[in-house]
């Protein structure tokens, strides 16, 4: 019986082959879901998905696109937003 904290499905079950030839069950936290646009819900490109300790190892320029609203709005929604701002 696994420890209580591993019985939840928030942990992914991974079978590892050890050097001794045994298959051992390991528990791994699942990857977070992909980032989506705040307006239309479309998947965002250029935004890595991973656990915080993996993302923290990346350079700032690799964490999200270097444009206004990068990592928050998709490119088409950002374009619409800029047009509306200019028209006001």
From Swiss-Prot:
Name a GO molecular-function annotation. Answer: structural constituent of ribosome
Record InterPro entries: Ribosomal_eL34, Ribosomal_eL34_C_sf, Ribosomal_L34e_arc-type
Please name the HAMAP family in this protein's record: Ribosomal_eL34
Q: What's one GO BP annotation on this UniProt entry?
A: translation
Q: Which PANTHER family match?
A: 60S RIBOSOMAL PROTEIN L34 (PTHR10759)
Return the protein name: Large ribosomal subunit protein eL34
Gene encoding this chain?
Answer: rpl34e
Keyword annotations for this protein, in alphabetical order, are: Ribonucleoprotein, Ribosomal protein
Q: What GO cellular component entries does it have? A: ribonucleoprotein complex; ribosome
Q: Which family does it belong to?
A: Belongs to the eukaryotic ribosomal protein eL34 family.
User: Per the UniProt entry, what species is this protein from, by scientific name?
Assistant: Methanobrevibacter smithii (strain ATCC 35061 / DSM 861 / OCM 144 / PS)
Query: What is one Pfam family matched by this protein?
Result: Ribosomal_L34e
């Amino acid at each position: 019986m696994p420890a209580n904290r591993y019985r939840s499905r928030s942990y992914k079950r991974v079978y590892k082959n050890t050097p001794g030839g045994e298959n051992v069950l390991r528990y791994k936290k699942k990857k977070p879901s992909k980032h989506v646009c705040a307006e239309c819900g479309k998947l965002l490109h250029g935004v890595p998905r991973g656990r915080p300790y993996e993302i923290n190892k990346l350079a700032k320029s690799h964490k999200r696109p270097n444009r206004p609203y990068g990592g928050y709005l998709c490119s088409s929604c950002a374009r619409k937003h800029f047009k509306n701002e200019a028209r006001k």
